[in-house]
A protein has these predicted regions:
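Short conserved beta-strand segments at catalytic cores or DNA/RNA-binding microdomains
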Residues: 67, 100-107, 169-182, 229-232, ...
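Short helix/loop capping segments that flank catalytic or ligand/cofactor-binding pockets
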Residues: 37-40, 76-79, 165-167, 183-185, ...
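Short, positively charged, Gly/Tyr-enriched micro-motifs
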Residues: 35, 52-154, 373-375
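Short, flexible loop/hinge motifs at secondary-structure junctions
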Residues: 1-85, 158, 208
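Mobile genetic element proteins and their domesticated derivatives, centered on retroelements
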Residues: 28, 68, 97, 111, ...
């Protein structure tokens, strides 16, 4: 696009190319002269790629019967444990189905059509569900490893969105750390989920919106919270759009003060750290000064506050003002909850297409697959390769791979 740097796909290395097609002119294309000289210059190159015809390798395992004269019985050699665990679909096909179900948001009907039209095989939707459940079992250990790690994190962003299970209302919670993201589906949207996942002694900073569950968790267990300033801005813009002139002016002053703080943040790379820290603290103090000073107020004959919106905003800052500025002194946490909201977007898309789950196994499968897909995206890893490695380890009764990158 105009004004944007040009991006070109890097050329395939020569070692990866299987077929070369050379073209040479026998005569000049303009005048027809046959006396042409080949130049010692590299050729123009146009590269292509194509998928081979999908060939399904079919295998058969045979166990022959033997008759034992001692016990008078027929015996068969046991099949290898990995073969029994695999069933009809071996590890790569199992990983592919799980990948399509999660990354591609494909329904079982869509996957069945893929198997029919591309692989020329027929399977039922029920069998495909069992295949995905095998992949889910393979991902249990990596998921549990992250679940146990969450209470130890120094900074977490949390959000929640609705989820349907058998027509019932559930909630998908997202916990985003620096190196990974974890999804948990629960019946409740209350603080109990935070308590179950993070415990009573969570010592990090929790980035979240202003929802009541976070308030309760914060107050019950003295948790440090960074409330989302983006949500705060939306509420302040509502004040600035009200018909009451004093309330509107109050909202506009608050917006201007917050805008000044974000201007400081945007110039972070141009400012030395001590000066940046001082500028942030000054911007914070100015916001609190505006929020708590000159708050419009008018009481009716019964002593009830008539400018309720401004009153509630000022009370929010009195009670929780500090929780909007933890990012100033806490590395790894930002002023907004955008990280968690971004992580949950593909789950919302999946919900729209697949229409939710139908029981505990389905919820567990979604939790684990979403966690793998989201974490691999953060780390620049292939979700398919991770699912394949986990499935392979599961079938072979080997330790599962980890979603935590090796450090050091």
């Amino acid at each position: 696009q105009p004004g944007h740097p040009r991006h070109e796909r890097p050329a395939f290395p020569e070692a990866d190319i299987k077929n070369f097609h050379d073209y040479r002119l026998d005569a000049c294309p303009e005048c027809g002269n046959a006396e042409v000289t080949f130049l010692d210059q590299p050729p123009r190159v146009l590269q292509q790629m194509e998928i081979e015809e999908v060939i399904v390798r079919k295998e058969e395992h045979r166990s022959y019967p033997v008759w034992c004269e001692g016990c008078q019985k027929v015996h068969y050699h046991p099949f290898p444990e990995a073969v029994v665990k695999e069933g009809l679909f071996k590890e790569r096909l199992t990983a592919l189905v799980a990948y399509m179900k999660s990354v591609d948001h494909a329904s079982f009907s869509t996957i069945r059509k893929f198997v029919r039209d591309v692989m020329n095989e027929k399977v039922s939707r029920g069998y495909l569900r069992k295949v995905v459940e095998k992949a889910s079992a393979a991902l249990e250990a990596p998921y549990e490893e992250l679940l146990k790690r969450l209470p130890l994190e120094q900074a977490l962003n949390v959000d929640e969105t609705g989820h349907k299970d058998n027509g019932g209302k559930f909630w998908t919670w997202v916990f985003r750390a620096e190196l990974y993201v974890l999804f948990k589906i629960d019946k409740t949207r209350g603080s109990k989920v935070l308590l179950d996942v993070l415990g009573e002694e969570f010592d990090g900073v929790l980035g979240c919106d202003y929802f009541s569950a976070y308030h309760k968790y914060m107050s019950d267990f003295n948790i440090t919270v960074q409330f989302c300033i983006a949500h705060l801005i939306r509420d302040i813009k509502f004040l600035a759009g009200l018909p009451d002139a004093e309330t509107r002016a109050y909202g506009e002053r608050l917006l201007a003060a917050i805008k000044a703080m974000f201007k400081v943040i945007h110039h972070r790379d141009e400012t030395d750290p001590p000066a940046f820290q001082r500028a942030l603290e000054q911007a914070r103090d100015r916001i609190l000064e505006v929020a708590l000073g000159e708050v419009p107020s008018r009481l009716d004959a019964n002593g009830k506050e008539m400018k309720r919106e401004a009153f509630n905003m000022a009370r929010r800052f009195r009670e929780n003002g500090k929780a909007y500025f933890e990012f100033i002194t806490t590395p790894g946490i930002g002023p907004t909850n955008n990280l968690a909201e971004q992580a949950v977007r593909f789950v919302v898309l999946d919900r729209r297409i697949t229409q939710g789950t139908r029981g505990l196994k389905g919820r567990e499968t979604c939790e684990r697959l979403w966690t793998v897909v989201g974490t691999c995206a953060m780390q620049g890893r292939s979700a398919f390769e991770f699912i394949l490695a986990a499935v392979r380890a599961h079938f072979r009764s080997e330790p599962a791979p980890s979603l935590l990158p090796a450090l050091g």
